[in-house]
UniProtKB/Swiss-Prot annotation:
This is Histone-arginine methyltransferase CARMER. It catalyses: L-arginyl-[protein] + 2 S-adenosyl-L-methionine = N(omega),N(omega)-dimethyl-L-arginyl-[protein] + 2 S-adenosyl-L-homocysteine + 2 H(+). InterPro entries: Arg_MeTrfase (IPR025799), PRMT_dom (IPR055135), SAM-dependent_MTases_sf (IPR029063). The gene is Art4. GO terms for biological process: chromatin remodeling; peptidyl-arginine methylation, to asymmetrical-dimethyl arginine; regulation of DNA-templated transcription. PANTHER family: HISTONE-ARGININE METHYLTRANSFERASE CARMER-RELATED, PROTEIN ARGININE N-METHYLTRANSFERASE. One of its GO terms (molecular function) is histone H3R26 methyltransferase activity. Methylates (mono- and asymmetric dimethylation) the guanidino nitrogens of arginyl residues in proteins. May methylate histone H3 at 'Arg-17' and activate transcription via chromatin remodeling. It comes from Culex quinquefasciatus (Southern house mosquito).
Length: 599
């Protein structure tokens, strides 16, 4: 671990033997290494001496025991302590009274954490799963490769460098430490990077390899439980989850304000959750038809019908995580703002959003759509990070909550009600929706479990909602081709290309290359702005594909395959934006045609 709490040499581990007498478990003295663990403390048993053994020096690791606030232990004399771990009772005999007292102080400190703010609001199983998830490098990579997320944070910090120059900075939930590095690059004098998962050890490794040990101090622990040696000028963090509040990391971010100096800065400074009614018959029927599986009365001779109602309720309790065309929204979004500088963490235990939507078009309201924006209000500039469906897609996507009973609404009507986000101990929220169509008796409500969303995003371009075309798409397409053909009209004279002026075009004589437009090296099915389609001049015709070297895949196909391999949880590998596309004709004379640069 990156934070070693204690290393105690010359210890003996005794257990009860077959004859009910204490015997040395390993037959020799050992070193007890105590280190940080998200759930308490890790006790590693090492061979005495040697140079290996899992970091920090010491001998070979013989065993490791997790010790937490629920672990049974008791004092045994001045130099011994009894711990029940690994399914057996261990008698730890230390080399000195001082070592024994140090070990007991660590246990006492750990036991005091059982009543920390975080532990009181979080189930043990949820916390364990949460910290394990964020302890994986692959998950950190997923977030870091979200270009919009990472680059917006970088710009917000760089463009407000005077807020960081020679300042003390706290990075809450530092993860890999990327924001801490940005702060140092902006001139921070000192950064305390606090990370509760085992990712802290990797963050420390990055700090060391980048020669920033004097600038960045990695602290392994929860912000609710650790102590800082000084107050800070700025707090930075990336605490947002789905629908802004999921994972309840925002409460941890706000808790960190106990270390913030008066008039200190917070990056981000505020968060806006947007809520809008939407119509999407296809999505509704998709969930509805899943539940209809249980309508079968003869499934391998078994009648499933009695479970259909329970299945329907379960499917409609799932928030949908994907993206959509904003034109499916039936009214202007309602904005709920949380000012991180003034809000208290208790304000996020129950969030009520009163809504009143003035319907802009007639149709069926199938539920409510959610997205968020956050602001970085610095001294020099204000930068916004948006997850709106009109903006480039991020790993937060957007979230939609369906009504099991949709509401038919007409243009000009008012749809009112409330949305309540009730925090639970699973680090998430129960989303309660209650809507009424004003002037009628029509109502609809639903309760959804934000901890159990349905990840629906497939990478395919988002289609426009039905009925969006106001002119004939067919005529528009052929008209565009006709106009392009008129501009590029050519004639063939004895097999030689001649332009519209009657002059021989020498540019493609003795060339087997097929002229085609530059193609940016990004597949339209990846994270792109909502509803954008691949342009006509970027398509590869079947005849072009047939003439290409079969050993070299054409870009329209190969980019897609590479994308599928490099798309990790919603983030795109940077190589997709840097590797040039090549179209090669089946001829030894052919030269590659490079795709256009993507900006």
């Amino acid at each position: 671990m990156c934070e070693q709490l204690a290393r105690l040499h010359g210890c003996n581990i005794l257990i009860i033997g077959d004859n009910d007498c204490l015997v040395n478990k390993y037959g020799h003295s050992v070193t007890i290494a105590c280190g940080y663990d998200p759930q308490g403390m890790s006790v590693r048993i090492l061979k005495e001496g040697g140079g290996g053994g899992g970091g920090g020096g010491g001998g070979q690791q013989l065993e490791e025991y997790p010790v937490n606030a629920k672990t049974t232990h008791l004092n045994h004399g001045h130099t011994s302590h009894v711990v029940v771990a690994g399914g057996e009772m261990l008698y730890l005999k230390f080399a000195s009274k001082a070592d024994c007292q140090l070990f007991r102080s660590l246990l006492q400190k750990m036991s005091g954490k059982v009543n920390s703010v975080f532990n009181l609001r979080t189930e043990d199983s949820s916390a364990s799963q949460y910290f394990q998830f964020y302890g994986y490098l692959s998950q950190q990579q997923n977030m870091m490769q979200d270009f919009v997320r990472t680059s917006t944070y970088q710009r917000a910090i760089y463009s407000n460098s005077q807020d960081f120059h020679n300042k003390i900075v706290l990075d809450v939930g530092a993860g890999s430490g990327i924001l801490s590095f940005f702060a140092v690059q902006a001139g921070a004098a000192k950064v305390y990077a606090v990370e509760a998962s085992n990712m802290a050890q990797y963050a420390q490794q990055l700090v060391h390899s980048n020669n920033l040990n004097g600038k960045i101090t990695v602290i392994a622990g929860k912000i609710e439980e650790i102590e800082l040696p000084e107050m800070v000028d700025v707090i930075i963090s990336e605490p947002m989850g789905y629908m802004l509040y999921n994972e309840r990391m925002l409460e941890t971010y706000l808790h960190g304000k106990k270390w913030l100096k008066p008039e200190g800065k917070m990056f981000p400074s505020r968060g806006d959750l947007h809520v809008a009614p939407f119509t999407d018959e296809a999505l509704y029927m998709e969930q509805y038809n899943k539940a209809n599986f249980w309508m079968q009365s003869e499934f391998h001779g078994v009648n499933l019908v009695s479970l259909r109602d329970a299945a329907m309720k379960e499917y409609f309790r799932q928030p949908i995580v994907d993206t959509f065309d904003i034109r499916i929204c039936m009214a202007k979004s309602i904005r709920h703002t949380t000012n991180f500088l003034t809000a208290d963490e208790k304000d996020l235990h129950r969030i009520q959003i009163d809504v009143e939507f003035h319907i802009l078009e007639t149709g069926t309201c199938h539920g409510l759509a959610f997205w968020f924006d956050v602001e970085f209000a610095g001294s020099c500039s204000q930068i916004w990070l948006s997850t709106a469906p009109t903006e480039s897609l991020t790993h937060w996507y957007q979230v939609r909550c369906l009504l099991q009973t949709p509401i038919f609404v007409k243009q000009g009507q008012v749809l009112s009600g409330k949305v309540v986000l009730a925090a639970n101990q699973r680090q998430s929220y129960d989303v309660e929706i209650d809507l009424k169509l004003e002037g009628t008796m029509i109502t609809s409500c639903n309760t959804l479990d934000l901890k159990n969303p349905y990840f629906r995003y497939t990478g395919a371009p988002v289609p426009a909602p039905p009925g969006s075309n106001t002119t004939s798409p067919s005529e528009a397409y052929w008209g565009q081709l006709d106009a392009q053909g008129a501009r590029n009209a050519v004639n063939l004279v004895n097999g030689i290309t001649v332009n519209g002026l009657g002059e021989v075009d020498m540019s493609i004589i003795n060339s087997n290359m097929m002229p085609m437009g530059n193609q940016p090296n990004i597949h339209p099915g990846l994270i792109s702005s909502t509803g954008r389609q691949q342009s006509a001049q970027q398509q590869v015709t079947p005849s072009q594909q047939l003439t290409m070297n079969p050993t070299i895949a054409c870009a329209a196909t190969s980019t897609q395959n590479v994308a599928q391999q490099q798309l990790i949880g919603g983030a795109i590998s940077p190589s997709l934006f840097t590797t040039p596309t090549q179209q090669i004709i089946n001829s030894h004379h052919a030269q590659p045609i490079h795709g256009g640069q993507f900006y």
